[in-house]
Amino acid sequence: MPVKNLKPFNASSRGAVLVDYSELWRGSPEKKLLLPKKSCSGRNNAGRITVRHRGGRGKVRYRLISFSRFSSGAPLFTKAVVERIEYDPNRTAFIALVRDFKTGLPSYIIAPEGLKKSDVLSTDVFDDMAPGACMPLGKVPLGTTVHNVELKPGAGGQLVRSAGSSARVIARDGNYTLVTLPSGEKRLILSTCHATIGAVSNADRKNTKLGKAGRSRWLGRRPSVRGVAMNPVDHPMGGGEGKTSGGRHPVSPWGFPTKGKKTRDPNKLSSKFIKSKKR
């Protein structure tokens, strides 16, 4: 999906670069696949802020996405046709409404790049390499770009789901397949785990510029205040006479080193599946 540069009608449109949604579905979403979504504004069940800089966005409804193409061990569909591509306010990627050829049941999936209306999607058809086809990693040819990758067979895709992201199948080792993730990390994943062919849609999102603070607020993002601009009671780097640099190496509001300090547990069980760290 291309981006559009707004003309400088006013200060907020000057320099703004937004995704062009003109090719997306303009009607209502599929009612059967909607759930109410309550905004918690970054608070937990005790009402305390656990995620900062969240809150104040417009009301949205959650779209039920089929991250797994299977239900109770059986495929949701073997063949399905794409009815339309839609905007989803809950994620950066676009979503596709697909309908099963046999039962006519609708489903939402993450739309891969290049998918369009009337395309036919397949599940476990191993000779179909079209974008949106789903199959086990063990059946994906080496060098193929994939997304929505499972970590456990049947659990649904957990990796590579954001706009424009993709992973690449590069090798096989026994019951495992070596996959290069968007971070550059090379990880072994069970060959029986499913993945979807192609890269995720809306790759141009990385080129956008919101142009004004209000657009961030529409998305539920509240302002982020620098620690050195706070008082000592609010942040370890706060206080001082005049403008100061904080007086110490950068830390989080809770005193943990930030700016690149590695926090992963070296004894984590999944470390044995990681063959190469992030670039």
From Swiss-Prot:
Which residue pairs form cystines in this protein? Answer: none
Which BP terms in the Gene Ontology apply to this protein?
cytoplasmic translation
User: Where do the record's region annotations for Disordered lie?
Assistant: 227-279
Record GO terms (molecular function): rRNA binding; structural constituent of ribosome; transferase activity
Swiss-Prot/TrEMBL keywords? Ribonucleoprotein, Ribosomal protein, RNA-binding, rRNA-binding
Q: Which InterPro entries match?
A: NA-bd_OB-fold, Rib_uL2_dom2, Ribosomal_uL2, Ribosomal_uL2_bac/org-type, Ribosomal_uL2_C, Ribosomal_uL2_CS, Ribosomal_uL2_dom3, Ribosomal_uL2_RNA-bd_dom
**In the record, which residues are listed under signal peptide?**
none
**SMART domains per the UniProt record, alphabetical:** Ribosomal_L2, Ribosomal_L2_C
Q: Which is one Gene Ontology cellular component term of this protein?
A: large ribosomal subunit
Q: Which family does it belong to?
A: Belongs to the universal ribosomal protein uL2 family.
The record's function comment reads:
One of the primary rRNA binding proteins. Required for association of the 30S and 50S subunits to form the 70S ribosome, for tRNA binding and peptide bond formation. It has been suggested to have peptidyltransferase activity; this is somewhat controversial. Makes several contacts with the 16S rRNA in the 70S ribosome.
Binding partners and assembly: Part of the 50S ribosomal subunit. Forms a bridge to the 30S subunit in the 70S ribosome.
- Entry-linked HAMAP family: Ribosomal_uL2_B
What's the protein called, per UniProt? Large ribosomal subunit protein uL2
Upper taxonomic classification of the species? Bacteria, Pseudomonadati, Pseudomonadota, Alphaproteobacteria, Rickettsiales
Which gene is annotated as encoding this protein in its UniProt record? rplB
